[in-house]
UniProtKB/Swiss-Prot annotation:
This is Exodeoxyribonuclease 7 large subunit. It comes from Cereibacter sphaeroides (strain ATCC 17025 / ATH 2.4.3) (Rhodobacter sphaeroides). One of its GO terms (molecular function) is exodeoxyribonuclease VII activity. Belongs to the XseA family. Keywords: Cytoplasm, Exonuclease, Hydrolase, Nuclease. GO terms for biological process: DNA catabolic process.
Length: 519
């Protein structure tokens, strides 16, 4: 009775798997069924651990797929994955048995469209501009003659060669190159590190600190130039204490580093032209300024000499200043002596009639008193005349003393001016004498450089690389037909010429004579 209520035995035809076997089977099915796939979605939850691998999600409105990009492939991606970016990822589907999930191993990645990439770029530009990183007030003037120029670019390629060649032609300068990757995952961190590294160099250190920086790269697509739109690069350019020129892409290409840089150059060659002036133009300007300075100095000396001569003619002579007062003094002295004689004679004439009526004694007393009075007056007049004469002489001597130092100062000032102008003229003459010699040296250096260029571009340099020149009758043979028709050939090698033996020139096949008519 109890057998009727026993459970039926489980079926034995369903295969039994271990967990590892089932996970491996699922892994083989997924990898074999899908293989290489392209998935379009939005990037979310980006993780960059110290191992260098990239872990992120690809999602849409209804599902999420885990994605992995190994370290070796992450550095070759054309764009840097960021959260919110819409991309098309190419890779292989696989599973991770340890967590029972499927995932895609990304091998390549591209933006889902130029419109999406431009929208993200515009959003980033607006955010950085709102912080003031692109303000014109932050931009600094470029140095006129930078002593050291730092270049951040790839060490190989046409960009660095164009910059060095242009700098060498215009004004040779000391150039420091910081090699970086200009495309891919490593581009942005290496460029930012190079800008900050140049700014960290100390003044007076073993490596000279640049006076100007150039960040350069050739043209490319928006994805190729994306590293220069990264926020880390823009912030490094804005924080640079060294003036910076951005020369990324062609004239039509614009990246965010162009807005943060102090100057933007349309091409790397134009950046070199912005960095330094033309040396020959500066030398020509200096020669012109030297000539103008010489003319101005000569004209200044001539005008001052003429003014000195005019002042010398206008200044009265010392003899003429003293002659008038001295003559008046002599006249007054002569008049005073005559006046004294006349006064004595007049008084004697008045006294003689009176003396005739006086007694001799009284007359003698009167005469004695008058004589004493006259003697006193004479002494008083003599003293007064002496004092007036001394005062007049002192006044003349004081006037003469004031005029003599003034004249001496004027003469000394004129001599100092002449000596100073003569020294300046001598220095200018020395510079003018040295200018032709310096110009001859510059011309000799330029001639030597042109001769080296001529030797480099000459065909004899080509002969040294294993080529040869074939001539026939003095003309260069360039075709096989001309060589076959030549009577002899002369071959020029690096170390001499070789003449091949004469031979008869090949003739074209003669046409058979036409058969004559029997009629």
């Amino acid at each position: 009775m109890s057998d009727l209520f026993e459970d039926p035995a489980p079926a034995r035809n369903t295969p039994e798997y271990t967990v590892s076997e089932l996970s491996g089977a699922v892994k083989r099915v997924i990898e074999g069924e899908f293989g290489l796939v392209r998935v379009r979605g939005e990037i979310g939850r980006v993780s960059r651990p110290a191992s260098g691998h990239l872990y992120f999600d690809l999602k849409d409105d209804r599902a999420v797929i885990a994605a992995i990009c190994w370290k070796g492939q992450a550095g070759r991606l054309s764009v840097r994955p960021e959260e919110g970016m819409e991309v098309v990822a190419t890779g292989r589907m696989t599973t991770f048995p340890g967590q029972s999930k499927y995932q895609i191993i990304v091998e390549d990645m591209a933006p889902a469209g130029a419109g999406a990439l431009m929208a993200m770029l515009e959003k980033r530009r607006a955010a950085l501009a709102a912080e003031g990183l692109f303000d014109a007030a932050r931009k600094r003037p470029l140095p006129f003659l930078p002593r050291v120029i730092g270049v951040v670019t790839s060490p190989s390629g046409a960009v660095i060669r164009d910059i060095l060649h242009r700098l060498r032609d215009r004004f040779p300068s000391h150039v420091l190159i910081w090699p970086v990757a200009v495309q891919g995952e490593k581009c942005a961190p290496e460029v930012a590190a190079a800008i900050r590294g140049f700014n960290a160099l100390p003044d007076g250190g073993p490596i000279p600190r640049p006076d100007l920086l150039i960040v350069a790269r050739g043209g490319g697509s928006l994805e190729d130039l994306w590293g220069f739109n990264e926020e880390i690069v823009v912030r490094a350019a804005a924080e640079s204490r060294i003036p910076l020129i951005s020369a990324v892409g062609h004239e039509t290409d614009t990246t965010l580093i162009d807005h943060a840089a102090d100057r933007r150059a349309p091409t790397p060659t134009a950046a070199a032209e912005m960095a330094v002036p033309v040396r020959l133009d500066l030398l020509a300007g200096l020669d012109g300024q030297g000539a103008r300075l010489s003319r101005c100095a000569a004209e200044t000396i001539r005008r001052r000499d003429q003014r000195l001569r005019d002042l010398s003619r206008a200044l009265p002579r010392l003899d003429s200043l003293v002659a008038g007062p001295s003559q008046r003094f002599d006249l007054w002295s002569a008049r005073l002596s005559g006046a004294l004689g006349q006064s004595v004679a007049a008084r004697r004439a008045r006294l003689e009639p009176l003396g005739a009526h006086l007694r001799p004694r009284l007359l003698a007393d009167l005469v004695a008193r008058q004589k004493d009075r006259l003697a006193d007056r004479g002494r008083g007049l003599e003293t007064c005349l002496g004092r007036r004469s001394e005062r007049a002489r002192d006044r003349f001597e004081a006037l003469s003393g004031r005029l003599a130092p003034a004249f001496a100062r004027l003469v000394a000032e004129s001599e100092r001016t002449n000596r100073r102008d003569a020294a300046a003229l001598g220095a200018l003459a020395a510079r003018l004498e040295a200018a032709p010699e310096a110009r001859l040296l510059r011309l000799a250096d330029r001639l030597e450089a042109l001769d080296r260029l001529r030797q480099t571009l000459g065909y004899r340099e080509t002969l040294r690389r294993g080529y040869a020149v074939v001539r026939a009758d003095g003309e260069v043979v360039t075709t096989k037909t001309a060589a076959e028709r030549a009577a002899s050939l002369e071959i020029e090698f690096q170390d001499g010429r070789l003449t091949l033996g004469a031979r008869k020139p090949r003739k074209g096949k003669a046409e058979p004579p036409a058969q004559g008519s029997l009629l």
